[in-house]
Amino acid sequence: MDGCGTYLDTMRREAPLVQCITNFVAMNVVANVLLAAGASPAMVHDAEESGEFAAIAQALTINMGTPSPRWVEGMEAAARGAAAAGRPWVLDPVAVGATAFRRGLGARLLALKPTVIRGNASEILALAGAETRGKGADSADPVAAAEAAAQRLAESSGAVVAVTGPVDFVTDGRRGIRCANGHPLMPRVTALGCSLTGIVGAFAAIRPPFEATAAALAFFGLAGEEAAKTATGPGSFQVAFLDALHALSPEALDRGARLEAA
């Protein structure tokens, strides 16, 4: 896939408003990542307004990291509002296979037709109803083990499915792309996976979801590579990563994106 820089340039010029229903651990990090990248975050989650706000935003992201009954109401209301308004929305099924509560929530959100599903291999396997070895929010399965399940999930749900890990895999059920951008320090900072979901939402707001998701993964991963050049550990990496998201140019993204057809 060519032209990732064009996707980034358009996202920054349009600065889409992205409604983020994320978890307690991730909220500040997700907002700062979106701001650094050039989007506009809104952390609107209560059911009293989440559905109405979803029609105002250009995209919605829903993260299952710390669900509670009231937050679940907000998630479902927002997903319905986004669908009614024709807005793209991204599902991040955090630890969806860990408990019966999460499995039920994942199934209900999946029925509300997300535009994109972004998760690690264990989460995608669980959401697709396959056997998984997930450990809470962490994956114990390699990306390659989830590729067939991702394709089936994309076909059955109509969503673009992104399985993220050392080498990411994106599919719409017919096509597939692998993205090799990223750095080993990225999983050592909490909420970066949640933040990636926000970036996917920002790109999906302005481009077709398959191409937008692949471009978002390349952008996020390449920023991680750039940040690692100056970081000495996870703490300095987090600061450098925000700076890299802000500084990465469309031209640099075109040069550095490592995408190939799968």
UniProtKB/Swiss-Prot annotation:
Signal peptide: none annotated. Substrate binds at M43, A191. Pfam families: HK. Its cofactor is Mg(2+). GO terms for molecular function: ATP binding; hydroxyethylthiazole kinase activity; magnesium ion binding. InterPro entries: Hyethyz_kinase (IPR000417), Ribokinase-like (IPR029056). Pathway: Cofactor biosynthesis; thiamine diphosphate biosynthesis; 4-methyl-5-(2-phosphoethyl)-thiazole from 5-(2-hydroxyethyl)-4-methylthiazole: step 1/1. Its EC number is 2.7.1.50. The keyword Kinase applies. Keywords: ATP-binding, Kinase, Magnesium, Metal-binding, Nucleotide-binding, Thiamine biosynthesis, Transferase. GO terms for biological process: thiamine biosynthetic process; thiamine diphosphate biosynthetic process. Disulfide bonds: none annotated. ATP binds at R118, T164. Belongs to the Thz kinase family. Catalyzes the phosphorylation of the hydroxyl group of 4-methyl-5-beta-hydroxyethylthiazole (THZ). This is Hydroxyethylthiazole kinase. It comes from Cereibacter sphaeroides (strain ATCC 17029 / ATH 2.4.9). The lineage of its organism: Bacteria, Pseudomonadati, Pseudomonadota, Alphaproteobacteria, Rhodobacterales.
